[in-house]
Design a protein with these regions (language model features):
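Charged, low-complexity intrinsically disordered segments
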Residues: 2-184
Length: 184
């Protein structure tokens, strides 16, 4: 499954055609960060991709998404250390149903610093991601199509701050900056 699914309505809607247009340029003018990307780098950079890492303050996590959710709840749930894939969404729903409040702080500088640290730990801990980053030059995009709603979702502008982190780690992988420069 590459993400190039045929829509069930059998109709080429404008939203679906926009999605197909983006897919046609994947790995030509951008790397799509998505579990269905045609590039292994795009798959590995997706937040739910299993690539265990250790954060010195928070410990071990299987995925970036698990860490992200762990730090976003007022009462951190240990399950986020190991839960993967779509089970992460189910764990989030359970936490909310149990009254555990989720803090919305994606624009918070401390949150973004923590995510930057975590992305660095994830990539430095996975030689395959690091190597592929060193060999890549294309910019990153994040988009998908919701078939049931006939909705093309492009989160690239919203996630630019995260792509900037990937770009900085890519500079490290390509020898353009030092680890010390990356951390500051």
């Amino acid at each position: 499954n590459t993400g190039h699914e045929i829509i069930t309505q059998g109709t080429m809607t404008p939203n679906y055609m926009e999605y197909e247009k983006m897919l046609a340029t994947e790995n030509v003018d951008h790397i799509r960060i998505n579990s269905k990307s045609t590039t292994s780098l795009g798959v590995m950079l997706e937040a739910r991709y299993v690539s265990a890492f250790y954060h010195p303050k928070y410990g071990m996590f299987a995925t970036l998404s698990g860490f992200w959710n762990f730090i976003s709840f007022e009462q951190p749930e240990e399950a986020f250390r190991v839960v993967t894939g779509k089970d992460i969404h189910e764990q989030v729903a359970r936490c909310r149903a149990n009254g555990n409040k989720q803090v919305k702080f994606a624009d918070n500088a401390d949150f973004r610093r923590l995510i930057k640290e975590t992305v660095i730990y994830k990539i430095l801990g996975n030689s395959k991601i690091f190597e592929q980053l060193s060999e890549s030059v294309l910019p990153f995009r994040l988009y998908y199509y919701k078939n049931q709603q006939d909705e093309f979702v492009d989160k690239s502008a919203k996630e630019k701050w995260l792509f900037d982190i990937y770009e900085d780690v890519r500079k490290l992988a390509q020898g353009k900056i030092t680890l010390q420069q990356l951390l500051h």
